[in-house]
Swiss-Prot record:
Classification of source organism: Bacteria, Pseudomonadati, Pseudomonadota, Gammaproteobacteria, Lysobacterales
Co-factor binding comment: Binds 1 divalent metal cation per subunit. Can use either Co(2+) or Zn(2+).
Catalytic activity, reaction form: 7-phospho-2-dehydro-3-deoxy-D-arabino-heptonate = 3-dehydroquinate + phosphate
Pathway membership, UniProt: Metabolic intermediate biosynthesis; chorismate biosynthesis; chorismate from D-erythrose 4-phosphate and phosphoenolpyruvate: step 2/7
BP-aspect Gene Ontology terms: amino acid biosynthetic process; aromatic amino acid family biosynthetic process; chorismate biosynthetic process
Family membership noted in the UniProt record: Belongs to the sugar phosphate cyclases superfamily. Dehydroquinate synthase family.
Keyword vocabulary terms for this entry: Amino-acid biosynthesis, Aromatic amino acid biosynthesis, Cobalt, Cytoplasm, Lyase, Metal-binding, NAD, Nucleotide-binding, Zinc
Record-given protein name: 3-dehydroquinate synthase
Positions contributing to Zn(2+) binding: E191, H254, H276
HAMAP family to which the protein is assigned, alphabetical: DHQ_synthase
Species per Swiss-Prot/TrEMBL record: Xanthomonas axonopodis pv. citri (strain 306)
């Protein structure tokens, strides 16, 4: 696809403000990349799918702009299965071997897994160094690269070990979407749909109208979707950077979705397990069904959401082989829970999400059982 040369930017306000820049060709802009490195050391963290396409170009761009810059590189295996304490340790070792000081910078070149790992390593190395997010997937551009939530998974659950560490900048080169597999594009669109579902009915309607263009990779439609999604997230993160309240709304479908991901053993390139966006799509439908069962919303709203996700070729049902009891056990470990009670993001219809602090497990089990 061809992309407009116009650039869009979204400012994220707060104690540590930064800018999200959205445009084609940004990875070749060495001056822009290097401007965020305060010292003489940078670590480029990428994965086995992304690095062959873009890592050499990023390193060359940095070297042209800053010949004095020492750039290390770590390439991890692609997929959620790499988001572990062991891989995190490899990133820390890479920083140590580079001789990175407190003015070093970690560049996260990849999707959500790379962004989470790089951000967490940056948060921990010498108690915090800069991280610049270079998202190459739609999901990372609209969600995981923005807001400073970083984490790794453990066998007991997803994102249970992590830190809040806002990036120094988010630089989203939309040219990278050209090499994004169709399945990963659809996964990112699930997170885009989420923004309409939680707070923007007009955006929800726009997504329905533009669904064909988005699935076909239309540059203008994708740029609009990315910018609008980032605007929504930036507004929420600025008001609630540490997820003490409103920011939890961004997790619509995630408690159910994370349970599915964890119970399946996480998706990876080439396997049939749901990836993150697909699991969130199923989770949003489950959250909508639970909302209707609790009398919070109309069943027709649930069907409207399910139909839109289906139109984007996203799953809407729990994969076979996962029991309600096993999924509920995973949900009990969700970070949003308080005092051992399920705390879920539900809704009162399209654009009207809210946090429900004490949801009965029996009601959840009934939804999980179908």
């Amino acid at each position: 696809m061809t992309l407009s040369r116009s650039s869009r930017s979204v400012d994220v306000d707060g104690a540590q403000p930064y800018t999200i820049t959205i445009a084609p060709g940004l990875l070749a802009d060495g001056a822009r990349l290097a401007s965020h490195v305060r010292g003489r050391h940078a670590l480029l963290l990428s994965d086995s799918q992304v690095a062959p396409h873009y890592a050499a170009g990023v390193r060359a761009a940095l070297s042209r702009a800053r010949p004095d810059l020492q750039v290390g590189e770590l390439v991890i295996a692609a997929g959620e299965a790499s988001k572990t304490l062991e891989t995190f340790g490899s990133a820390i070792t890479a920083l140590a071997e580079l001789g990175a000081t407190r003015d070093a910078c970690v560049f996260a070149l990849g999707g959500g897994v790379v962004g989470d790992l790089a951000g967490f390593a940056a948060a921990c190395w010498m108690r915090g160094v800069d991280c610049v997010q270079l998202p190459t997937s739609l999901l990372a551009m609209v969600d995981s690269s923005v807001g400073g939530k970083t984490a790794v998974d453990i066998p007991q659950g997803k994102n249970l070990v992590g830190a809040f560490h806002p990036p120094r900048a988010v630089i989203a080169d939309t040219d990278t979407l050209r090499t994004l597999p169709a399945r990963e594009l659809r996964a990112g669109l699930a997170e885009v749909i989420k923004y309409g579902a939680i707070r923007d009915p007009l955006f929800f309607q726009w997504l329905h109208a533009e669904r064909r263009a988005l699935l076909d990779g239309d540059a203008a439609a994708l740029a609009q979707a990315i910018a609008r999604s980032c605007e929504h997230k930036a507004e929420i993160v600025a008001r609630d950077p540490l997820e003490k309240g409103e920011r939890a709304l961004l997790n619509l479908g995630h408690t159910f979705g994370h349970a599915i991901e964890t119970e399946q053993g996480y998706g990876a390139p080439g396997n049939d397990n749901l990836n993150h966006g697909e699991a969130v799509a199923v989770g949003m439908v489950l959250a909508a069904r639970l909302s209707a069962a609790l009398g919070m919303s109309d069943v027709q709203d649930t069907e409207t959401l399910r139909a839109l996700l289906h139109d984007f070729d996203l799953p809407t049902e729990i994969p076979p082989g996962l029991t309600p009891q096993a999924l509920l056990a995973r949900m009990r470990l969700d970070k949003k829970n308080i005092a051992g009670r399920l705390r879920l993001v539900l809704w009162r219809g399209i654009g009207k999400a809210e946090v429900v602090p004490d949801v009965e497990e029996a009601a959840v089990l009934e939804i999980l059982a179908g």
